[in-house]
Amino acid sequence: MTTGVGNRVTTITAAALEAIRAHGVQTFPDECCGALIDVGGVIVDAFALPNTTTSGAARRFQIGPRDYRASEARATELRGALAGFYHSHPNHPARPSQHDLDQAWPNFSYVIISVNAAVPGDITCWHLKDDRSAFEQGELICPTES
């Protein structure tokens, strides 16, 4: 796992982190995507969602309105909150693209996993700057993983 240098810290359980890794491998060479559910200040669930893009799933992801609502329902079911989203970058670094920036919403965490040749790699966490001009890398910590 790669941690960032920003001042925002996102804590995630080992189970949620493993779910992101597994989803990235399962969908390779396409991008995976899903929702991050926070309960008590910790991401406890990485809720897999279908990638509904029509612009080439190997380079893009899209979460449709129905799946967004399903994410909110999952958060309510867990008595938590929708904290953000995750997706994979097949055969590319775990850094946000311009497309990621263009599609991002404020106040969410964005976790990106690099999956190279179907092997999970670095995982990073990003937050949209208040002026929406860029992402700032945050720190992703998993208390039970070193």
Predicted regions and their residues:
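Conserved beta-strand-loop surface patch within small alpha/beta domains used
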Residues: 1-82, 90-146
